[in-house]
């Protein structure tokens, strides 16, 4: 904001604006003026750049022209969406006074603050993604982290112990807005994130947090929520809740509990693992060819959001998983009937949040009614499903016949967007409203009846009833008959050829008609608000119903996917290990134009590490990733792409796959690789699944080999994690001879003439050839380069004392060998008989051969 030195020099309207702006200095202020929201001074300049709207000037105040930009009120949602997507927050200032009775500027106040993490408007949200507000706190013992989805009321907290875990949480939750304390030490952890909001220290005070949360939940303490002994998480949660209340300017009745997320309850995946497994986002940042793109055929937005939460937080409780498996199995014969009905339920979860915030629009209530209308059919279909968990969901979703009847009576079939447009409440719902509407709509009929009646009563054939904007309703009699006007006719206007009169009945009717539209609209708004009061006492049951419907959508979807994609139900075992028969990569098999080659896998305490060798393009990375994805799918309760799967307990999944420079942080490919490797070696346990792909690249051969060897030893002997270790260092294939629990497998390739066929099938034992030059030739590397590479390869093999180990079988020849031309010097030597040469001839041959080389 430009410095305003002399406040009194401004006009009263600008003084009002400046007072309101001073309360919200860091965010944009939309100031309502008639049919527009106006922005002034620096706000106007900023908005014109962000929204690409015209920057103009408005008169002058304090002797200076005022920079101004404006947007029409009816298009405000579109502009808010643009600003929120850019991480901006906006204070919405409305006229709350009556211009007709106001002395000076109309009274205005900020009625809500729209921020990226607290939006609930349908137009501003991505319907199939959670939109989270988060707060982060740090002290000497670790981190506190809280998230709130204001569009559903889901409130969570956690206490990540270290920086890596905190980074993984930030990546998993991906908040739209993040609150942090002004003295937050680990700024590098959050720098570059969208929607950062610096908050004063006192907002994170623990006693204030407990008080805020108890007040919100109507409790004396937080023991019942299991968060009493999580002080760091509570500090974050307290700040977050206060911020949500401040921005919404209303109570938040849909936030009725808080849940502690504990590491031991779910499989932990760090940021690199989530990225490498391409769960909801591919490596390029898009949504194509991700696990979600294959698994998510849910028919409601709230079901889609729940499935993504499951995928990012696989549960370790086998009781929950077995229940989900049983439900999926029971639902497989009912998916075709259930999905079309579920599709009609829509996004009930977010509609309920807007109801709680009292911002639900008429079409929200119409959609809620439509959702209620699906419940009887859903309940009837589910009655036939022989499954206790399904019947529990059926009961939880309820029926809400009374609320359905209420909304069917109250709201018209296709209501307008806004209640202020009128015509929302159905005819017959309220007698007084019907009367006001009849007055507004039926004025012409009444006037015609009055004219006929008065003509008959007075006998005056020139009498007629009319209306004009200046004098309102009137009875007009020609000047020739005006002396016969009844005594109760009061003169209103004299014309050249007629007199106009008013009677008490017509005056009363005039007052009614002129105010009927305004009264009808005011009463309609009142009745609409009363609908909220009738619905909100049922909010808790409605939220449970929405949750049950979302879960049913996810489970029906997983049942459909299992049947359509030929998935099998995995079996959980007590000991660490993974045994997969005919396993497939869930994403790759969908994008291939040819049948996917299924592969087995066997990991157990006695066979806990597989050294995977084979050619580039042979399928090593696919094989490793499919193992992790099958494990991940099993631990959300889903069926999996395989013929048979047995899987033991898993606490973490780690991946060190692929490589990329982190230029923004000044870290090279090798540094990124080593950082991820260090995280694995520090945090993996015997219950962890570890994928290590090409460890040791990016440095010298011997450095890389030494690091890869030491890492493999550590994982196999000390940590004893279940490990898939892909490598091009053939020396590592000796590890099974040197330690227990390690085995070699390889991906096969076949040569056929001048071509190479990658079989993509996993075989026991080490690979016999590298095929690096073959792949280079396939990629189109020029023949002369391939030829030179082969010459160099032979030189290196002849020099290396460990050539045999490097080659495994002594051959490193490319399958796509380009026939070499015989050197002229070699040809000359082959034709030479040294025994027949004189000393002079021998000397001449040496010079000749020298010239040929």
From Swiss-Prot:
One of its GO terms (molecular function) is damaged DNA binding. GO terms for cellular component: cytosol. It comes from Escherichia coli O127:H6 (strain E2348/69 / EPEC). Coiled coil: none annotated. This protein is involved in the repair of mismatches in DNA. It is possible that it carries out the mismatch recognition step. This protein has a weak ATPase activity. ATP binds at residues 614-621. Belongs to the DNA mismatch repair MutS family. PANTHER family: DNA MISMATCH REPAIR PROTEIN MSH1, MITOCHONDRIAL, DNA MISMATCH REPAIR PROTEIN MUTS FAMILY MEMBER. This is DNA mismatch repair protein MutS. One of its GO terms (biological process) is mismatch repair. Keywords: ATP-binding, DNA damage, DNA repair, DNA-binding, Nucleotide-binding. The keyword Chloroplast does not apply. CDD domains: ABC_MutS1. SMART domains: MUTSac, MUTSd. HAMAP family: MutS (MF_00096). Gene3D superfamilies: 1.10.1420.10, 6.10.140.430, DNA repair protein MutS, domain I, MutS, connector domain, P-loop containing nucleotide triphosphate hydrolases.
């Amino acid at each position: 904001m430009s410095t305003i030195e002399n406040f009194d020099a401004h006009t009263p309207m600008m003084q009002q604006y400046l007072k309101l702006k001073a309360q919200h200095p860091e965010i944009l202020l939309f100031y309502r003026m008639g049919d527009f929201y106006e922005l002034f001074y620096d706000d106007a300049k900023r908005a014109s750049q962000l929204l690409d709207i015209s920057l103009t000037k408005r008169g002058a105040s304090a002797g200076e022209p005022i920079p101004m930009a404006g947007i029409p009120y009816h298009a405000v949602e579109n502009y808010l969406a643009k600003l929120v997507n850019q991480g901006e927050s906006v204070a919405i200032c409305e006229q709350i006074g009556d211009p007709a009775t106001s002395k000076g500027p109309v009274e205005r106040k900020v009625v809500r603050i729209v921020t990226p993490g607290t939006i609930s408007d349908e137009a501003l949200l991505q319907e199939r993604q959670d939109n989270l507000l988060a707060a982060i706190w740090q002290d000497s013992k670790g981190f506190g982290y809280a998230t709130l989805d204001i569009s559903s009321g889901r409130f969570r907290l956690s206490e990540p112990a270290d920086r890596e875990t905190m980074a993984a949480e930030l990546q998993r939750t991906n908040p739209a807005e993040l609150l942090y304390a002004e003295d937050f030490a680990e700024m590098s952890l959050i720098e570059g994130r969208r929607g950062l909001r610096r908050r004063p220290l006192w907002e994170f005070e623990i006693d204030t947090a407990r008080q805020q949360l108890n007040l919100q939940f109507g409790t004396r303490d937080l023991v019942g929520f299991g968060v009493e002994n999580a002080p760091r998480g509570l500090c974050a949660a307290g700040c977050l809740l206060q911020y949500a209340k401040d921005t919404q300017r209303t109570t938040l009745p849909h936030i009725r509990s808080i849940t502690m997320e504990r590491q031991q309850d779910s499989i932990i995946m760090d940021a690199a693992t989530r990225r490498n497994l391409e769960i909801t986002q591919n490596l390029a940042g898009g949504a194509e060819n991700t696990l979600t793109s294959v698994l998510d055929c849910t028919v409601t937005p709230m079901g889609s959001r729940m499935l993504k939460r499951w995928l990012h937080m696989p549960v370790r409780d086998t009781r929950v998983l077995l229940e989900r498996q049983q439900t999926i199995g029971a639902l497989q014969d009912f998916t075709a009937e259930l999905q079309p009905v579920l599709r009609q339920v829509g996004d009930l979860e977010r509609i309920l949040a807007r109801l709680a915030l009292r911002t639900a629009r008429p079409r929200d209530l119409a959609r809620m009614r439509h959702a209620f209308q699906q419940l009887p059919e859903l309940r009837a279909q589910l009655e036939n499903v022989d499954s206790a968990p399904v019947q529990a969901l059926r009961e939880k979703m309820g029926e809400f016949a009374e609320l359905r009847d209420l909304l069917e009576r109250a709201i018209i079939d296709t209501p307008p967007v806004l209640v202020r447009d009128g015509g929302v409440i159905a005819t017959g719902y309220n007698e007084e409203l019907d009367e006001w509407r009849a007055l507004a709509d039926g004025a012409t009929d009444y006037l015609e009846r009055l004219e006929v009646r008065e003509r008959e009563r007075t006998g005056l054939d020139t009498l007629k009833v009319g209306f004009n904007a200046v004098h309102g309703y009137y009875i007009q009699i020609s000047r020739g008959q005006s002396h016969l006007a009844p005594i109760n006719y009061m003169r209103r206007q004299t014309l050249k050829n007629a007199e106009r009169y008013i009677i008490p009945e017509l005056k009363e009717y005039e007052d009614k008609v002129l105010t009927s539209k305004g009264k009808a609209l005011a009463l309609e708004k009142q009745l609409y608000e009363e609908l909220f009061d009738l619905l909100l006492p049922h909010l808790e049951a409605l939220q449970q119903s929405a949750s049950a419907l979302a879960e049913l959508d996810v489970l029906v979807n997983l049942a459909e996917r299992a049947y359509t994609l030929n998935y099998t139900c995995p079996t959980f075992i007590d000991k660490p290990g993974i045994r997969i028969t005919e396993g497939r990569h869930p994403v790759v098999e969908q994008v291939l134009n040819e049948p996917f080659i299924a592969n087995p896998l066997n990991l157990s305490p006695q066979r806990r590490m597989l050294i995977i060798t084979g050619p580039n393009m042979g399928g090593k990375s696919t094989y490793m990733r499919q193992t992790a994805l099958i494990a991940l799918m099993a631990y959300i309760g889903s069926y999996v792409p395989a013929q048979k799967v047995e899987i033991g307990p898993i606490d973490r999944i780690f991946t060190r796959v692929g490589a990329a420079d982190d230029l923004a942080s000044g870290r090279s490919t090798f540094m990124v690789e080593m950082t991820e490797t260090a995280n694995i070696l520090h945090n993996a346990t015997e219950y962890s699944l570890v994928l290590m792909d090409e460890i040791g690249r990016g440095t010298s051969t011997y450095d890389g080999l030494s690091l890869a060897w030491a890492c493999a030893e550590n994982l196999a002997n000390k940590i004893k994690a279940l490990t898939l270790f892909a490598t091009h260092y053939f020396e590592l294939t000796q590890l099974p001879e040197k330690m227990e629990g390690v085995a070699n497998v390889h991906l096969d390739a076949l040569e056929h003439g001048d071509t190479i066929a990658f079989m993509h099938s996993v075989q026991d034992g080490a690979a016999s050839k590298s095929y690096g030059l073959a792949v280079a030739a396939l990629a189109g590397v020029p023949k002369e380069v391939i030829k030179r590479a082969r010459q160099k390869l032979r030189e290196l093999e002849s020099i290396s004392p460990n050539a045999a180990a490097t080659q495994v079988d002594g051959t490193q020849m490319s399958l796509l060998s380009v026939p070499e031309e015989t050197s002229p010097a070699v040809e000359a030597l082959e034709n030479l008989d040294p025994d027949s040469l004189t000393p002079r001839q021998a000397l001449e041959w040496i010079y000749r051969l020298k010239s040929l080389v």
